[in-house]
Regions:
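Conserved catalytic-core motifs of GNAT/GCN5-like acyltransferases
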Residues: 118-120, 130, 135-152
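Conserved GNAT-fold acetyl-CoA-binding loop/helix
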Residues: 19-45
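A short beta-loop-alpha structural element at the N-terminal edge
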Residues: 2-16
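A short helix-loop-beta-strand connector motif used in the catalytic cores of GNAT acetyltransferases and
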Residues: 42-58, 82
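A conserved beta-turn-beta hairpin within the catalytic core of GNAT-like acetyltransferases
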Residues: 73-84, 93, 112, 143-148
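Conserved beta-strand in the GNAT
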Residues: 58, 64-73, 82, 87
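Conserved GNAT acetyl-CoA-binding A-motif
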Residues: 109-122
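Conserved acetyl-CoA-binding loop-helix of GNAT-fold acetyltransferases
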Residues: 88, 94-107, 131
């Protein structure tokens, strides 16, 4: 298994992975309408666009993409970052791959320069992120209007 940076050639496979995971794993927490709307925002062109302003990673096992995740600036901030598109293929869930993706993102320069990191967490994944030290933003422990939990982690650094 290797973790490497996303390339444009990965866009189709990453899009398919994300959509399949939403339909398989997240379907217990979200309506079909919500998942269909999400699918429209997870097309290959969306993955390519996301990679222009984030550091986007993929996880490969025997040349098959089995996971992905990205980190980038939070609304252009130099001191805040956000995690995006963290997905693991349903067959590989529960095997530590999601944790490896988070560890990779937490070693990225966008994480290391940030004092605060935010993640829009699905209902399905909120407990996973909480185990890794992310807590409810402003203490709000319910989904927002997008049906996502807003989680955050603070880093105490010497950065200005």
């Amino acid at each position: 298994m290797i973790i490497r940076r996303f390339t444009e050639n990965d866009a189709e496979k990453v899009s398919a992975l994300i959509i399949r995971t939403e339909k398989t794993t997240n379907s217990k927490d979200y309506s079909e309408e919500w998942i269909n709307a999400f699918e429209k925002r997870a097309q290959p062109s969306d993955m390519i666009e996301r990679a222009t302003w984030t550091h986007f990673y993929v996880v490969e096992d025997n040349d098959t993409i089995i996971g992905c995740g990205a980190i980038g600036p939070y609304w252009g901030s130099e001191t805040e970052s956000s995690l995006f598109n963290i997905f693991v293929s349903p067959e590989y869930q529960g095997k530590g791959i999601g944790r490896k993706i988070i560890e990779t993102l937490e070693q990225d320069e966008y994480f290391l320069r940030a004092k605060r990191i935010e993640i829009p967490a699905s209902i399905t994944a909120v407990n996973f992120y909480r185990k890794l030290g992310y807590d409810f933003k402003n203490g709000v422990d319910r989904p927002d209007e997008e049906q996502m939990y807003r989680l955050e982690k603070f880093r105490y650094t010497d950065n200005p």
